[in-house]
Amino acid sequence: MELTLLGTGAPEGLPRPDCPCASCATAVGDEARAATAVLVDGALLLDLTPGPAFAAARAGRSIAGVRQVLLSHPHDGPAVEFPAGLPAPVRVPDGRELAVISGHRIRAVALDAPGTGYEVTAADGERLLYLPPGAAPAGLNGPGPGPDRPGGPYDMVLLDVLGRPDALARLRSAGAVTATTDVLAVHLDHDVPPGRELHRQLAAAGARTVPDGTTLVVGDYHAVPDLPRRTLVLGGARSGKSVEAERRLESFPDVLYVATGGTRPGDADWAARVALHRERRPGSWRTAETTDLVPLLAAEGPPLLLDCLSLWLTDAMDSVGAWDDESWADGGADALAARVAELVAAVRATPRTVVVVSNEVGSGVVPATASGRRFRDELGRLNTMVAGECEHVLLVVAGQALTLR
């Protein structure tokens, strides 16, 4: 099955006319995108883009052989240009199947938002799933085939990856997307980050995007985004490090969020911060409040998000009496070193996908107290040792993630 992406952008395209935002200002060349439309084997057209005949011609294709045009957008969506010579576009009712003279079988997929998704099966059995912007499949309740998703994993999925990362998480949870599925981001709007940051965020989700006019063959080998198993995200206070860490896992199901800060009775500010974090996280994530990280790292299971090492270190230093100079000299330093070594070894040996958050505190004002300087030094050492065990290390500054490794 051969796909030509006549457009990969949102319905309004990218850049949007007269929009001064950074994404629109930098959407030039390959980053400029028309409304998403996909030509399948020259015979099936999924959605319409402005000037589809011209878009196809620029890609070295023709729409003269199109036998079916399917619309996925909501009925009250933007008006579409309908060129002469094409079959009248239709929407297939949810759950209905359609056989096309070209040999393709099409099934309409019910969604959790207005619009229609389409599962397309070629004569040789290759399967793709196409979803409209802002939508996820409805009824994905568990892994394996069922009436809502027969046939096992898809060979290719095209969806709004950054707009609905939970849609990709649901598909992964149901076994409809696996490591062999080619995940393509489409419907890209001006709320996506500009330039290389877009491709970095997509790679972290196990997805990619291609320029308008690209032709792909379903099942062909391609460079699958390398998903790091262990990632350390560093940053200062309010730098956006936790948001970045959450973003790296929001397209994966059943994440366990490990909060090392615990509860602080009577601290309204702390309670507000915790509530904000919980609101931001996907509803499918679970939360554990603990500083006992080694058993979690040693166990098999879904991805872990550990937030954060600085609070873990505070608790560890409390337990060994590190704030008192005499206790520190009388075995406290050695006890802390042993606990740090145990944690670092657990990060090295963990079978799980792990994203670890930590503060970067060594670049600011020198702490006024000996205990403050001790904490700064120990956190710097801890960050260095954990970074040494991670495939990917990021530094977040002003909400921008800089790749260190």
Q: Which ranges hold each PLM region?
A:
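Cap/insert and terminal regions of metallo-dependent hydrolase folds
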Residues: 137-223
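Conserved P-loop
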Residues: 9, 235-299
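Short, conserved loop/helix-junction motifs that constitute active-site signature segments
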Residues: 61-65, 82-86, 148-153, 171-180, ...
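A short, acidic, amphipathic alpha-helical segment used as a generic capping/interface helix at domain edges
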Residues: 137-140, 145-146, 164-176, 243-250, ...
